[in-house]
Every structure is written in structure tokens, then in C-alpha cells.
Amino acid sequence: MASLNQDQIKILEQSRQRLVQLTRSLASLIGSLNQSDPLPSWSSLQSQAGIISNNLVSISEHLADNKDLLSALVAYPGPSYPGRTQAPTLEQLLRTKLDPRVEDWVSRGRRAGASALEDRGALSESALAELWDWAPVEANQEARRRNWGGNFTLEEREMGIQNVVTGLRRQLEDEDEEASESEEEVEEEEMEVVGVRRRSGAGAGLEFDIAAPAPGSRQQQQQQKAAGPAVPLEDILRYMTTGIPPTQR
């Protein structure tokens, strides 16, 4: 191969810098695990893992973009290289095969990738879209049929709640009977959606069942507001993925 030009040397230097960053990130994580007592916090470990993941993605993209050049390069020592004092480094540079452990990782990754590409039983994008369009309506209808919110399902009520074997020592009470016995004043409140189903006939779309909330729901909402501010969904998802506690608003 002819001598390298400046652009090719720049690509090699970028490869070296990315590998150095990955090595330092891994060394930092290993050091924190070995030296910290107790172990580092979850947010710290998650942050270090995120940095390592970003470094791996950067190296993978860089190697893929410059695959032709890197696969054609051949390393050999120059006359001025200290081969006697730097023999281990020279052996690593001149090595043509991967480490046995690394070679096993690579082969397993290639097999997993090939099997994923050959998996023709997976749903297509149109089938997935149709599934997501069908699932919410069916789940809502199933929930309405079974009345998941109470202690007993609709089928258990029809067969008699006294015949239901719960395995509990305490006696479960039917929520419908409690509601009929308690007399509370109905306040004017906003309507809410309690059911959804597909519209039959020529017109396409969905039909929604609207009903007033149960008595006392406004009081429950006021109690919830008094208990503390609600945490936004974005902060909850951020805490689940990064371990960083949500900020109080």
C-alpha cells in the first residue's frame, strides 16, 4: 500500500482518540466499583454506563464509515521502533487474529444479527400499526366486561360472591352494595369517558361512553392535591432510565 495521505492519517488519529476515550471510561467505571464502599449511587453508575454506551456507538459508526481504509491497512514496525523494550505492544499491533474471548463475542453477535434478519415470522409495520389500532379498543371492552376496578368480576357477581374462594381470612365486601347503602349528595362535576368502541355502519371512527364520576370524586381529587404536587410523566420516565430523582415543582 502506498504511503498514507493527511486525510487517512487523520482517520487513524480519530480512531485512536475514540479508543482512548472508551478505555478511560471503562477504567473509571471499574475503579469506582472496586474502590467505592459502599458502591456508587445508581445515578452515578447510570451516568457512567451512558458515557460508555455513547463511546461504543461513536467507535462503531467511525469504523463503519471508514471500513475500506481500515481493512486495507497493514501495520509493520519501522527501523527506529524499540522492538526489544516494547515487544508486548508490538505483538498486539502485529496480531492478525482476535483474542479467543473477543472472537467468541464477535461470532455470537454475528449469529444473533443473522437470525434477526432471517426472522420472517415477525410482524410487518402495517401489521403492527393494525395491532396497535385494535388493541386499545379491545382492552377497554374487556375491562368493561370484567369490571377490573372492584373486588369481584362480573362473572363472579353473576354466580354469587358468596361462592368465590379468595383464600383470604378477611371477608371482602361488594363495592356495589356499599354504594347503594351510603346516601351522598351528587355534586355537579365534569363528565368523563368510561368506555370506547368502534362505530358500526358506514361511518368510520369510535364511539365514547360518557358518564358522570362517582360521588365524592371531587373530594378525593382535592385530597390528592393537598397531599402534594403531581410529578410530571417526563420526570418519572427520566428517573426510570437515569436514576436521577425528579425535581419538585
From Swiss-Prot:
Residues 173-192 have a biased composition (Acidic residues). It is found in: Nucleus. GO terms for cellular component: core mediator complex; mediator complex. Residues 154-200 form a coiled coil. GO terms for biological process: regulation of transcription by RNA polymerase II. The keyword DNA-binding does not apply. It comes from the Eukaryota. InterPro entries: Mediatior_Med8_fun/met. Residues 211-232 have a biased composition (Low complexity). Keywords: Activator, Coiled coil, Nucleus, Transcription, Transcription regulation. Residues 170-249 are annotated as: Disordered. One of its GO terms (molecular function) is transcription coregulator activity. Component of the Mediator complex, a coactivator involved in the regulated transcription of nearly all RNA polymerase II-dependent genes. Mediator functions as a bridge to convey information from gene-specific regulatory proteins to the basal RNA polymerase II transcription machinery. Mediator is recruited to promoters by direct interactions with regulatory proteins and serves as a scaffold for the assembly of a functional preinitiation complex with RNA polymerase II and the general transcription factors. Belongs to the Mediator complex subunit 8 family. Component of the Mediator complex. This is Mediator of RNA polymerase II transcription subunit 8.
